[in-house]
Amino acid sequence: MTERSVGYVETKHHHLKEPFRLVSGDELAEVSIAYETYGKLNSDKSNVILICHALTGDAHAAGWHEGDKKPGWWDIVIGPGKAFDTNKYFIICSNVLGGCKGTTGPSSTNPQSGLPYGLSFPRITIEDMVNLQHTLLNNLGISRLYAIAGGSMGGMQVLQWAVSYPGFMKRSIVLASTAISSPQQIAFNEVARQAIIRDPYWNDGDYYGVELPKQGLSLARMIGHITYLSDDSMHDKFGRDIRENEMFQVESYLHHQGDTFTSRFDPNSYLYLTGAIDKFDLSNGYSLAKTFSNIESEFMVISVSSDWLYPSYQSEEIVQALGSNDVDVQYRKLISHFGHDAFLLEKGQLNYLLSTFLGHLTVGDVMSEDVSTLHEGCTLEEAAQLMILKNATHIPILATSGRITGIVTSWDITRAVANKISSIENILSRDILTSRPDESLSSAALVMEDHAISALPVVDDRGCLVGILSSDTISAMVGKGTK
C-alpha cells in the first residue's frame, strides 16, 4: 500500500425502506445497494463526486479490502493528491442495479419466493441504475454533486444523469463511452450472451445452488477482453510468444481471464447488464441535440485513440450535440495503444486531464521555483554560459526589484551570434506572457499551446518572478504517451 492510497476500506450497504419502481413500471419490493466512500464530506456537502463503474465493475473503486491482491479498479485516480483527491473530495461509488456485488440483481433473493430471482428479475435500463443512485444519494442527504464520472457503461450512466437530473451536478466526465449503442457493440454482447445461454448448465437461468454455466461465462469474458484490447497492445503484450503448454501467450491470457471471472460474476447479471447497454439510446428516436437541450453541467468527454469498441467518433457525436446547446464542453483524446481499457490504465494522462477539469490543479502546484535568472545589463556571454551550465533554454531577465523585464532564449542567442549582435538588450523579448500561481493549469497550458511557447514565467502580484512553468513539466505529469 502506498502513501497516496485511501488505505483499507469496507463496503457499506443501504437498504431502501420503500419498493423501487422501474422505468418499465415493474417494482422491486426490496432493494439493497452496495457502496463505498472515500474522503471526508464537508459541512455543506458540496464536495461530493459520484463514480460510476463499467460492465463488470463494482463499488470497490479504490483502496484495499482485507486479502486483496490489488486495489480497487480506479485506484490510479482516486486517493490523496490524485485527480479525485480524497483530501478535498468525498467520493462515492455504488454497485449498479442488476449487478452481483452487493446491489440487488438476478442472484438476489426474491422476497416473494425465498429463492434467487434468476430470469424472474425484471428487465432494467441504464436509467433505472441512475434512478437508484439518485435515491441512494437522497437517502444519504446529498442533494448536489460537485462532479460525476464514469467510463464505458459508467459513461452511459453519467450521460443519463445529466439528462435525467440536469441540475444535480456541477461537472460531468464521460470516458470511452457512447450515447447510443452501435450495431457492432450489440453484436459482441449478443455473442457473449449466447455463449452463456448455450452452456449445458444454463438451465434457463435457474442454476443457483447447483452447477453454474461457467464455460459460457468464461467464453463471454474472453470475447469481452478481445474488444477491450487493441491490435497494438496485443502485439506488445503477447506477440506470437508460446507458453510451455504450447499455447500462444494470448490464448493463455484469455483462458486465465475467462476462468478467473467465473468465480466473481453472475452469468445472469452479465445478461441483464449487457441488455441494458444494448438498449441505451439517448436520442430517443430524435436527436442527441434535442435530448441534451436541458443540460446544465460542464462536461469533459474523453475518448481513446486506439479504442475500437467505443471509437472516438462516438465521443465526438456527444461533444457536437452538447456544443449545439452551448454546453461548456471540453473534448480530449487519450493517446494510448491500450485500446478501450486505457481509461483504466493511463495513469499520467488521466490524472492530468481530470485534475485540470475539476479545477484544483494550479500553476503554483507544478511550477519550478528553481529558476536560473540574470539581471539587466548582463552580457550575451553570461547568458550563453548560464544556459549551458543549467541546461536551460529560457533565462528570465530581472530588474533589481525582482520584477521580470524580459526573457532571452537559446534561439535568441543563436540569432545574435549569426547576426553578430553584441548586446543582449537588442535580442531579448520584452513583450512576454506570464502566469500567476493561482491560475488553473489548464488555462496556462492553453496559453502556451496557442502561442507555441515552451515556458511561461510565473509572477506574483508585484510582477516579481516566483517560478516558471515549462512544457516539459506538463509532459512529465502526463507521462509518456503510448503509440
Swiss-Prot record:
EC number(s) per entry: 2.3.1.31
Looking up InterPro entries in the UniProt record yields:
AB_hydrolase_1, AB_hydrolase_fold, CBS_dom, CBS_dom_sf, HAT_MetX-like
Spell out the molecular function terms from Gene Ontology.
homoserine O-acetyltransferase activity
Q: Does the keyword Cytoplasm apply?
A: yes
Per UniProt, which keywords does this protein have? Acyltransferase, Amino-acid biosynthesis, CBS domain, Cytoplasm, Methionine biosynthesis, Repeat, Transferase
Location comes to: Cytoplasm
The biological pathway it contributes to is: Amino-acid biosynthesis; L-methionine biosynthesis via de novo pathway; O-acetyl-L-homoserine from L-homoserine: step 1/1
Q: Active-site positions, per UniProt?
A: 152, 307, 340
State the name under which the record lists this protein: Homoserine O-acetyltransferase
Source species of the chain:
Methanohalophilus mahii (strain ATCC 35705 / DSM 5219 / SLP)
